[in-house]
């Protein structure tokens, strides 16, 4: 089957920066960025249970009061980190499907981008969909989440502002596509696909399995 997309290069893992010395001063904006970077390192290393304001301050090498001044509480920190995740997530999906010529190819490329992002950023991905830990009243998170949804909606050929009413047919198509790739990503992160992949011919993995499900070309990894 001839691809109608150019193979997207594998997204680079977000650079992990070393811990900054406690004595190093921060500009106001740089401090916020440093706190988010520290929070992401903790999230990927220790999981959401290990991410507290005190732990983030210690990781960034700043006073314990610093994260509270910027984010209010741990829910605020998690929400801003999730917003950053959704922004990077949307960019990865758009980049993956940029050269696609058909709706089917776009959906396949976005599906691969969706699962690849989850595979490379498991802690951040899980946080982004932990609604009970996030505050969607925060403008940054609400806007970033809506933008990610619009990427998926656009892939099936629906265009319009986020508050535009959807027909049942369009809503069903968006939900079907979203459920497929999100469910696959969750099964993969939980390790539930490993026994299935182990029974497949050599040279196959979760991504080739996803390609077979989506019916599109599997990008080079």
At which residue positions do the language-model features occur?
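Basic, helix-initiating cap at the start of DNA-binding domains
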Residues: 1-46, 54-55, 59, 76-79
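Intrinsic, short, N-terminal disordered tails of RNA polymerase sigma-factor systems
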Residues: 1-3, 7-10, 156-157, 187, ...
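An amphipathic alpha-helix adjacent to DNA-recognition modules
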Residues: 29-37, 44, 49-50, 70-94, ...
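Short hydrophobic/aromatic patch on the recognition helix
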Residues: 61-71
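Amphipathic alpha-helical linker/stalk segments
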Residues: 84-107, 139-147, 160-163
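Hydrophobic alpha-helical connector segments
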Residues: 94-124, 145, 167, 173-177
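Short linear capping/connector segments at secondary-structure termini
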Residues: 95, 128-135, 194-195
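Hydrophobic/aromatic-rich alpha-helical bundle segments in the mid-to-C-terminal region
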Residues: 136-142, 146, 159-211, 220-221
């Amino acid at each position: 089957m001839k691809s109608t997309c150019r193979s997207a290069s594998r997204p680079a893992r977000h650079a992990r920066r070393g811990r900054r010395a406690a004595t190093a001063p921060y500009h106001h904006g740089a401090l916020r960025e440093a706190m988010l970077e520290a929070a992401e390192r903790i999230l990927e290393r220790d999981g959401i249970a290990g991410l507290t304001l005190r732990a983030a301050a210690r990781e960034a090498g700043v006073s314990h009061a610093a994260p509270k001044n910027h984010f209010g509480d741990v829910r605020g920190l998690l929400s801003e980190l999730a917003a950053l995740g959704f922004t990077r997530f949307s960019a990865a999906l758009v980049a993956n499907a940029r050269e696609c010529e058909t709706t089917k190819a776009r959906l396949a490329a976005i599906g691969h981008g969706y699962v690849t992002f989850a595979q490379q950023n498991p802690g951040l991905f899980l946080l982004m969909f932990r609604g009970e830990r996030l505050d969607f009243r925060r403008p940054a998170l609400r806007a970033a989440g809506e933008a990610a949804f619009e990427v998926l909606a656009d892939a099936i050929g629906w265009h319009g502002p986020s508050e535009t009413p959807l027909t049942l047919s369009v809503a069903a198509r968006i939900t079907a596509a979203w459920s497929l790739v999100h469910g696959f990503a969750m099964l993969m992160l939980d390790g539930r696909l490993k026994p299935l992949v182990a029974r497949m011919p050599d040279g196959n993995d979760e991504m080739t399995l996803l390609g077979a499900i989506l019916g599109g070309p599997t990008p080079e990894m």
